[in-house]
Amino acid sequence: MFKSLSLKVIIFGFIFTFFSSFGQSFFLGLFNSNIRDALSISHGQFGSIYASATLLSSFILIWLGKKIDEIYIFKFASLVTILLSFSCFFFSKISSVAFLFFAIFLMRFSGQGMMSHTATTTVSRYFTKSRGKALSTIWFGLSSAEFILPVFTIYSVSYTHLTLPTILLV
């Protein structure tokens, strides 16, 4: 189906769409009630913060997304990966409404925005003949994450005392 280099590009796209999940609504929504309880905010307040941060990230994506055409893809992908890692760490340290806004902005921008943008742009550049087939293949990464991450996350949060020993056993 795909040649060696083509397969590497597909795997790259699959991985990036998989990890774009950290900025997707289905994943961030898993923490909604815990965040609202910790910060004593309502559903409406959380929704307003979420929507505002998402809009800001989409506007900035328009400006920064075009940088993928100016920067070597390996360097660009590395920067996006580092930004997502920082975003996840920052998201885990939310302590105020202002931090919540910034954390959601970072997660939406780096995860949903830049990770998926990097995946689709890279794959679209590489494939000319089978572009549709290649893009549909990489988006299986997001579908896989929609199945795997919520289960793994709920398990990890619910059984925190068992998570480390389980990982060490595997």
Protein language model regions, located:
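Extracytoplasmic
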Residues: 9-33, 41
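Helix-breaking motifs and short loop linkers at transmembrane-helix boundaries and internal kinks
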Residues: 40, 93-95, 128
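Residue-level signature of mid-helix packing/kink "hotspots" within the transmembrane helices
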Residues: 54-62, 147
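Conserved MFS/SLC helix-loop-helix module at the cytosolic interface between two early adjacent transmembrane helices
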Residues: 59-84, 88-91
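Hydrophobic core of transmembrane alpha-helices in multi-pass small-molecule transporters
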Residues: 99-113
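Intracellular juxtamembrane helix-capping segments at the cytosolic ends
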Residues: 114-127
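Glycine-rich segments within core transmembrane alpha-helices of 12-TM secondary carriers
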Residues: 132-149
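Conserved small/polar residues in nucleotide/adenosyl-binding loops
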Residues: 160-166
